[in-house]
Amino acid sequence: MTSQELTEQILKKQSFLCVGLDTDLDKIPTYLLSEKDPVFSFNKAIIDATHQYCVAYKPNIAFYEAIGVDGWKALKKTIEYLHAEYPDLYTIADAKRGDIGNTSRMYAKAFFEDLGFDSITVAPYMGKDSVEPFLEFTNKHTILLALTSNEGAFDFQTLKTGDKELYKKVIETSKNWQNSENLMYVVGATKAEYLAEIRKIIPENFLLVPGVGAQGGSLEEVCKYGMTKNVGLLINSSRKIIYASDSSNFAEIAGAKAEAMQNQMASELEKL
């Protein structure tokens, strides 16, 4: 899916919501544990209840890796289900990969070719040659970690390197790489005050923004400083939606939470 196609979906649905599928066997309703594939059963129920209110889904790969082969099978089934039933929805592999070139090339093949994700999160710390293998897939997006939502972001990401903070250096350097139009960036909602400066560097690229909801980030602040004329935002919400309830009607309640966020987003889109 191209950035233009993603924007079209956002305007059509009046939503730039991304639902994070951080599926944890310790948190899903206990009755699902008797299912043959409880992770997929949970994901399917969440997707069916929320798809009309969002434009993207973001499985956090660690939650699937943690349960071994069964987790990978559930992840693949989830993506295949999305492709079959809701092909207009954008998919993000929240994998935070990044390694020397030949290793990154294998990561790219795994997530783009085998699993068929539209995009993947990548840690850019090892530099250009660790990111290029992902950018070689010109029909996919590479989402670089720029300024993350966790408290530890201040340990390194805001340190000055020369006359600029490290996160700014990452953004400024990467925008000159090949196929940089296929780059997106992770900027946490808890760092909304930095968005105006970031938009001076990358006025058009999409930003994936975690931290609205459970981490306390403000949707209004993110939109105020980060939204572009083409929207340019994907706001992720995971726990606030998927774990809104552990009762038998968990999916219905998740759908209501997603709808509430979609309504807020529609109000923000009216300001464009």
From Swiss-Prot:
<dbReference type="InterPro" id="IPR013785">
    <property type="entry name" value="Aldolase_TIM"/>
</dbReference>
<feature type="active site" description="Proton donor">
    <location>
        <position position="96"/>
    </location>
</feature>
<dbReference type="GO" id="GO:0044205">
    <property type="term" value="P:'de novo' UMP biosynthetic process"/>
</dbReference>
<dbReference type="Pfam" id="PF00215">
    <property type="entry name" value="OMPdecase"/>
</dbReference>
<dbReference type="InterPro" id="IPR011995">
    <property type="entry name" value="OMPdecase_type-2"/>
</dbReference>
<comment type="pathway">
    <text>Pyrimidine metabolism; UMP biosynthesis via de novo pathway; UMP from orotate: step 2/2.</text>
</comment>
<dbReference type="InterPro" id="IPR001754">
    <property type="entry name" value="OMPdeCOase_dom"/>
</dbReference>
<keyword id="KW-0456">Lyase</keyword>
<dbReference type="GO" id="GO:0006207">
    <property type="term" value="P:'de novo' pyrimidine nucleobase biosynthetic process"/>
</dbReference>
<protein>
    <recommendedName>
        <fullName>Orotidine 5'-phosphate decarboxylase</fullName>
        <ecNumber>4.1.1.23</ecNumber>
    </recommendedName>
</protein>
<keyword id="KW-0665">Pyrimidine biosynthesis</keyword>
<keyword id="KW-0210">Decarboxylase</keyword>
<comment type="similarity">
    <text>Belongs to the OMP decarboxylase family. Type 2 subfamily.</text>
</comment>
<dbReference type="GO" id="GO:0004590">
    <property type="term" value="F:orotidine-5'-phosphate decarboxylase activity"/>
</dbReference>
<dbReference type="InterPro" id="IPR011060">
    <property type="entry name" value="RibuloseP-bd_barrel"/>
</dbReference>
